[in-house]
Amino acid sequence: MFVMLISVTDKSIHGKNMNGYLKRILNARVYDVAIETPLEVAQNLSARTGNTILLKREDMQPVFSFKLRGAYNKMAQLTQEQLKRGVITASAGNHAQGVALSAQKLGCKAVIVMPTTTPQVKIEAVKHFGKRSVEIVLHGDSYNDAYDHA
């Protein structure tokens, strides 16, 4: 296992130009809703591997997961017309919470389809983060059932 950190001054990785990729990262609007989380040294894992292993503490995000970053970044790129129409997703967990918080922050309606087997704690978290922006639909016994329904 290795962790690679790329600084803004790096020009390439594995022979590929990273300027466009880094520009997209630096211009992402995720910090409208996400927090900048620290890197922490994983002492035991570093000792076992003989390398310095850093962990990105995404558990410190408002939804306790990195999934908020992708959901918000995608939704923040939608046009006003698209946001007005709303979004729909299928998820039984962290992605649902990320979409819910993103919808609430962007003033967008979101339908989140979750399997009927979703733990109540996850359903309540989605309600909490989405407030009145979210409609939860429980459908099917599995993620695939929920996905097909969405």
Segment roles from a protein language model:
Residues 3-150:
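PLP-dependent amino-acid enzyme catalytic core
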